[in-house]
Amino acid sequence: MRHRQIAVRDTTLHVAEIGSGGTPVLLLHGWPEFWATWLPLMNRLHDQFHLIAPDLRGFGDSEKSAVPRSDVGANSHADDMAALLGALGLESVGVVGHDVGAYAAQALARRHPQLVDRLLFFNCPTASVGGAWVHHGHVNEVWYQSFQQLGLAEALVGTSRETCALYFRHFLEHWSHRKDAFEPAFELWIDNFMKPGNLRGGFDWYRSQNALRLAAIDGHPTPSVRIHQPTRVHWGRHDPILKSEWSAFVPEHFDDARISFCESAGHFVHVEAPDEAADVLAEFFGGR
């Protein structure tokens, strides 16, 4: 595993890479995650692909903002990734997105289509979800999206290692169908979020998405260009926060999307069912 700090635009991103041959594949993590969420796949596929796992702006070991920001949404992350690929000398890559990374991957395909050969998603939220965010039975799932925009959220969650662990254990267990999926790496997760600025970096995503999400809930989603690249979606059947039935919205945004489901996983298919996820990735990007 190689680790680098690479200057892009107005920030510096941490990038983990493994594998020197084969198709380059960019792995875009979600929240509450960072580059290491891809380790199960990187360990399985490094002999077939050049795997590139950055920490998104504000996450992991990438540069942090000194103050809360509300301008680091999907387009910002997409432009960061375009600059990163340029710095790495890569003209076109396969892209894997999950959660926040799924939004960023879609924005990358729309804003910089020449850089994206094909797309794989381990859940694929779209603007068409709209009012489903606050439907009966789901509204209680999204409380954290408002809480994390408050100034006190960072102070409360980061009061101590214990409070940080309590907070993130909730999401890693509740969103997983296999409840012990993150247990081997749990302390690494808390190490990550206890680093200065790492709570803020993740919370900034929700500040940045708030206006767009509220508009979509009100029936006014941001118009988007359809994505033409070949696309594969492998959604965890038991995902409680990005529900698998929302896969029905995917064809509204993609011209060439194949959708399947992981019956043994919730939100984190790549961690809960890594063998299956690795097989899907390898088949789609031509590794085996």
From Swiss-Prot:
Catalytic activity: an epoxide + H2O = an ethanediol; (R)-epichlorohydrin + H2O = (R)-3-chloro-1,2-propanediol; (S)-epichlorohydrin + H2O = (S)-3-chloro-1,2-propanediol; 1,2-epoxy-9-decene + H2O = dec-9-ene-1,2-diol
Active site as annotated: D99, Y206, H267
InterPro entries: AB_hydrolase_1, AB_hydrolase_fold, Epox_hydrolase-like
Statement: the UniProt record of this protein carries the keyword Membrane: no
Keywords in alphabetical order: Hydrolase
GO molecular function, one term: hydrolase activity
EC number: 3.3.2.10
Cited Pfam families: Abhydrolase_1
Positions of the AB hydrolase-1 domain: 24-274
Disulfide bonds, paired cysteine numbers: none
Lineage: superkingdom: Bacteria
SUPFAM superfamilies the UniProt entry points to: alpha/beta-Hydrolases (SSF53474)
Biological role: Catalyzes the hydrolysis of various epoxides into diols. In vitro, shows the strongest activity toward the linear aliphatic epoxide compounds, since it shows strong activity toward (R)-epichlorohydrin, (S)-epichlorohydrin, and 1,2-epoxy-9-decene, but very weak activity toward (R)-styrene oxide, (S)-styrene oxide, and 3,4-epoxy-1-cyclohexene.
Assembly and oligomerization: Homodimer.
Homology family: Belongs to the AB hydrolase superfamily. Epoxide hydrolase family.
UniProt name for this protein: Epoxide hydrolase
Origin species: Bosea sp. (strain PAMC 26642)
Classification lineage: Bacteria, Pseudomonadati, Pseudomonadota, Alphaproteobacteria, Hyphomicrobiales
